[in-house]
Amino acid sequence: MQAIDLRRVLLSFLILMSPGLISAQDTDQWFTLGNDYAHTRYTTADELSPENFGDLEVAWEWDGASFGAVSGRSTPSLIDGLLYTVAGYNRHVIAIDPKTGETVWSYREPKTPRAEYSMRADYGKGVAFGYIDGRGVVLIVSPGFFLTALDAKTGVPLGDWGAPVGVDGFPESGVVDMLKDLGHPYDPYEGIPLETGYITSSSPPIVVNDTIVVGNSAEQGYHQARIENVPGDILAYDLRTGDFKWKFNVIPKPGEYGHETWENDAWEWTGDVSSWAPLSADPENDLVYIPTNSATIDYYGGFRPGDNLYGASIIALNASTGERAWHFQFVHHEIWNFDTPTAPVLMDLSVDGQEIPAVVQATKQGWLYTFNRLTGEPVWPIEERAVPASIVPGEVLSPTQPHVTWPEPYSMQGIGEEDLLDFTPELKAQSLATMEDYVMGGLFNPPIHADNPMGKYAAMNCPGGAGGVNITSPPVADPVNNVFYLSEHTACFALRLIPGEEADLLFPNSTGTTTAQYANGVPGATARPPRHPSGLPIWKPPYSTIVAYDMDTGEKKFTVPTGETPQRYKDVFERAGVPESVYGNTGTGALVPMVVTPTMLVYSDQASDGTPMLWALDKDTGEIAAEMEAPARSSYGMSSWVHDGHQYIMLQTSSKLTALALPAAQAESGAH
């Protein structure tokens, strides 16, 4: 026991001294999107506790409406006494005074058609930061796929960095046009021809030692019937100069590892496999971890037979050279919209007496995949198991898929009669009648097509392409106690395909030249699942939970519903004669933003009447330790940092940023 305690103390010291959390002039920083390179979203700040949680007040609000902010996806970074964030469809870069919430400076890239086309324009999630000879530098990737380096104090583009991009209005220095390094024909103003494909960005780059590593985004696969696209290759640049360093091909070319997983010569003309989720890094070992999207398109891959590396994978690359250290593919020949949605989380574990430098990936599938982050060896066995074949003409799925044997799943995987709403005989009968037109099955239940031999409407997929863990609620981790916390929900999809030429008519501004044999059968993400006639979800609650794992053992510590049962659900259950003791707290059904501190796990959701709330949970049991009404709903992340001696909690509230602190931190109080 003494050895374990000593290890925790030593680890606490190392966390305090790590580059992502190092103190600077009375400021406990929030260095990256996830606070540290490990993306733990953990703060060492401890002024706030369950005892004073109820005393939190709004210290200030920053309103991004003038910058066109809408979604609130960006988690600000607090570095050297300033907050840095992005906002709006033009992805303004903004520096904010953390004491007052006043804008210090802002920068906006000149408008271009290639940026205005972006379907991820208002999806900016934050900035990256580095130092050049002691000078702070803010780095941003724009919707138009330009990399810009700004002086952290002034917001002015760096001199003698990057190269002229050949577009009117852009600075002569401080910018890199990254399209030139992808290797496709393009126009600096218009971008890559849309019939070829499209590349944009939502997550920030990451600085690993002296290398800037850049991911990217593509057009959503559920909004397309086309088969042509460009690959989302990973790019890297020199931090000091902006010079190009390397490119990693996410769709392997002839002679490269994994090329044989692309049959039908699909590697030549299809694409995606982007890395739209944030990246993580291990600077000490010069490794960067890339979570990838699926290949073009969602729900049908008959034109791209094979396992399709490196789709739906995690890739560990040497940050200096771009060489692959290892990879693991979570889903072979991915068609379920099971892309990898959140940053990998790095933790140093002690498993059965063995110290393991680990990386943990939460997924939509309801599994935590855990690896030795240096070698890629699974910490616990992952087995290939048989899965159903497709009945859709032209589709050939992998006969097996990886199955995590430990830790236990955190979400409902698949749906059967036992999962349906059945609290009364009438509710059960209605559930069964509703599901008669749908094919139920396991996690890898494949889509079906219209006019299928079974006469069914769609195939159920649970927890669904929007279920499990997703980008709206990044996981958090306590690296001192090695506990991993995640927010999950069930959001089953009903997968229905129609002929590609018909599907193409459903999508506005279609740009492809060749359509797939089959494609998504409805506009939007996919066919929504059927609802119970009562208005409830067709499956039993809880609908959303926070799950905690002890990652040294893989055991679940607790599972608790998020928020409170919505009043509309209570009313339905009351009419059906179902007491609350039977259905319990259903959870709101929402994914929730979280941050973890030395004394509590903080999250935001809603009370039964829709009131926005903040809850502080006991980190060991999940029990509510404190709660308070929040000023607004928040999502996509939460952060906590110290400025001028006081701890703040930052909420991302749509177009605004809301800073909470104790009364002593209020700007007008004069407290220091």
Positions of predicted regions on the chain:
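Bacterial N-terminal signal peptides that target proteins for export
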Residues: 1-10
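Bacterial N-terminal signal peptides
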Residues: 9-20
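Mature N-terminal segment immediately following signal peptide/propeptide cleavage
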Residues: 25-65, 547
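Repeat-blade elements of multi-bladed beta-propeller folds
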Residues: 30-34, 69-92, 118-146, 195-224, ...
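Short, solvent-exposed loop/turn elements at domain surfaces
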Residues: 37-43, 66-71, 94, 298-299, ...
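Short aromatic-glycine motifs in intrinsically disordered, low-complexity regions
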Residues: 40-48, 145, 306, 463-464, ...
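Extracytoplasmic/lumenal domain signature
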Residues: 51-65, 93-117, 133, 147-195, ...
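Long, low-complexity segments enriched in small/aliphatic residues
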Residues: 280, 401, 405-491, 501-502, ...
